[in-house]
């Protein structure tokens, strides 16, 4: 649905359960993939505070930022979830954030639909959509994304 070849989809055996991802574990997992893809362009959720950021997602951002500062990640961008943007700017006024309007709206909608896919027989449980349905619905109507550099 997202246009990614099946051979490029990786399910991490060492993944954490919801609410249990630490920066250290995230770092370990990111490093594993950087060994395989050393020039990867890394995109993840911002490591900086805002009221609605899921702690597991923030751990990924913290680990990626640390690896960037060590020179292990060369190209890094952080996303600020649209529902957190106002609070993010209030708490992080000096972080320059720019809007990204998807030039390929169809890809964005396909990616969102992957999170909505319900097919338990094939391991698709629509977990992302079920946990934050209102956020997906909002993104479907307001397709603006917010991004910042390290």
Language-model features: locations:
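The feature marks non-catalytic terminal segments
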Residues: 2-7, 24-25, 71-150
């Amino acid at each position: 649905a997202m246009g990614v070849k099946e051979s490029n989809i990786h399910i991490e055996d060492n993944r954490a359960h919801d609410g249990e991802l630490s920066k250290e574990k995230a770092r370990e997992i990111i490093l594993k993939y950087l060994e395989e893809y050393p020039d990867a362009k890394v995109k993840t959720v911002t490591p900086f505070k805002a009221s609605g950021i899921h702690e597991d997602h923030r751990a990924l951002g913290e680990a990626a930022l640390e690896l960037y500062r060590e020179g292990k990640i060369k190209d890094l961008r952080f996303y600020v979830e649209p529902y957190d943007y106002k609070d993010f700017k209030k708490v992080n006024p000096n972080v320059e954030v720019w809007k990204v309007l998807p030039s390929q709206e169809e890809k964005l909608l396909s990616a969102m639909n992957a999170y909505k896919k319900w097919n338990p027989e094939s391991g698709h449980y629509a977990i992302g959509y079920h946990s934050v349905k209102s956020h997906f619905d909002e993104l479907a109507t307001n397709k603006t994304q917010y991004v910042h550099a390290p």
